[in-house]
UniProtKB/Swiss-Prot annotation:
The gene is WFDC12. Residues 1-23 form the signal peptide. It comes from Colobus guereza. SUPFAM superfamilies: Elafin-like. The keyword Transferase does not apply. Antibacterial protein. Putative acid-stable proteinase inhibitor. The keyword Disulfide bond applies. This is WAP four-disulfide core domain protein 12. Residues 80-111 are annotated as: Disordered. PROSITE patterns: WAP. Keywords: Antibiotic, Antimicrobial, Disulfide bond, Protease inhibitor, Secreted, Serine protease inhibitor, Signal. Gene3D superfamilies: Elafin-like (4.10.75.10). Residues 101-111 have a biased composition (Polar residues). Residues 27-74 form the WAP domain. InterPro entries: Elafin-like_sf, WAP_dom.
Length: 111
C-alpha cells in the first residue's frame, strides 16, 4: 500500500469516527426543559444517562441533584410568556392565596 493510499485511509477513518461520535453525543432533543437545580454538590454522581435518547418516554437527560439522570421535563413557556416566570416548581390552583391566622382577606395582617 502506497503512502498516498495510507493517508486517504487514515483521513477516511478520522472522518467516520467524528461523524459517529457526533451522532452519539447529539441525537434528537425531547420537548420541554430540564427542571431548575439549586443543589450544591461536593461530588458528582455517576451519570445515569448521556442524551435524551437514553431516557424512556418523555423523560429527558438532565443534570439534577449532583448527576445526570432521566427526569420528567417542565413545559416550555408559551410564546410571549413572562421569561422570568419560574416554571420549575409547583404552582397553586387559581384563586388560591396564602392566609395566616389573624390576616385579612387581602393577606395583610390585621392591626
Amino acid at each position: 500500500m502506497g503512502s498516498s493510499s495510507f493517508l486517504v485511509l487514515m483521513v477516511s477513518l478520522a472522518l467516520v469516527t467524528l461523524v459517529v461520535v457526533e451522532g452519539v453525543k447529539g441525537g434528537i432533543e425531547k420537548a420541554g426543559v430540564c427542571p431548575a437545580d439549586n443543589v450544591r454538590c461536593f461530588k458528582s454522581n455517576p451519570p445515569q444517562c448521556h442524551t435524551d435518547q437514553d431516557c424512556l418516554g418523555e423523560r429527558k437527560c438532565c443534570y439534577l441533584h449532583c448527576g445526570f439522570k432521566c427526569v420528567i421535563p417542565v413545559k416550555k413557556l408559551e410564546e410571549g410568556g413572562n421569561k422570568d416566570e419560574d416554571v420549575s416548581g409547583p404552582h397553586p390552583e387559581p384563586g388560591w392565596e396564602a392566609k395566616s391566622p389573624g390576616s385579612s382577606s387581602t393577606g395583610c395582617p390585621q392591626i
